[in-house]
Structures are given as C-alpha cells and as structure tokens.
Amino acid sequence: MMRWYTAVGVKMEHLGGLFCVQVGTENKILSGMEIFIWNALLWSFVEETQIYGRMVQLLKAVFPEKDLDGKTGKDEFNFCFRRLITRGLIIFCECETEKEAAENLLQNAIVARVMRNSGERFLMFCESFACGTPFWKALSVFKKEPMEERYGQFLLKIEKCGEVRYYLETTEQPNEILEMLSLLYQKKILFIRSVKEVTIES
C-alpha cells in the first residue's frame, strides 16, 4: 500500500497579507515552508515519497536565484509536514493507485468552486510550472478553463451544496460523479473545503 496526500482548504484573502486557508468554517494561517508544502499538494493526489521533491521544485520556481538541492530544509519540511496533518490542512489515505486515492478522499469531501482571482491564478501558475509544465502551457491558467463551460450546470449545484456524499447518494452512477469531481479538482476548478470523515487503513 502507498500513502497518498492532498491539500484541504480554500485560499482566502487576508487583510494583513498573511497566507490564510479556510478549512470548513475555520481560518488557519500558514507560514514559511507550510505554504509551499500545502501548494505542492493542492489540486493533486501525491504519493508520500514524491512530496518533498515537488515542494523543492515549487521553491525553485518561486526563488530561481537561490541554490536549492535535495537536502534543502529537510528537517523543517518534516516538522511543517506533520504540523499540516495535525491542523487538518492535508489529508491522506492508503491505496494502490492514484485513482483509488482520489475516490477515497473525495467521497467524504465538501468541495467548493474556485473563484479565480488574480492571486489564485498566480498560485496555479506556480504549482503547474513547479510540476514541470512548460512555461507557455502553465500560462494557460490565466485563461478560462473550457471544462467550466462543459460542467457549468453541475458547478452551479456545487456552489449551493458542496457535499460530495449527497451527489453520490442521489445518483445511479456514483463512479461517474467521482471521476468528474476528480477531474474538476485536478483541473484546478474545485477546492476541497473540508472532509467529513476519512477512513485510513493502518
């Protein structure tokens, strides 16, 4: 079994300029490396051994002038990583595949539509570029996502009720709903606002 992680919460504007994430109804302030770990896991399902490398790539994208290597801030990373789990800002499950992880984590989620202000679009650009997307392609986040039009009616429903369990219990095709939600999440159209319950296998 592999352990897969993703980020929880909705990035919020903060009057003091702090990095604020809302999980459920609670606002939580992130600082230092916490910010980069959270962003490295946002809109993706990442196997545990890949997380540190993704975070380093994100740091390189944001601070290209700094000399970063494979040992950069490892102790700080471990501390911040554990802290994010404790604070409910990242969640995990144990599955064999990324697809199984997406279904496991999303089925208990409450999701929210991404309201794409300039700050969020910039974060999406940084995350995409850090994951190896060519610069010109990463810039596409500043354009309207075609899938927002394709799934427009469903997204309007999400704005009223983001509880995934509700849609799974009121449809004859729950697997298709989960696949659609996974696609919308990984296309950076949805946030996971919170998770009601996650069963974690030991």
List each language-model region with its residue ranges.
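Short, amphipathic alpha-helical interface elements at domain boundaries
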Residues: M2-V46
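Long, charge-rich, low-complexity alpha-helical segments
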Residues: I29-S202
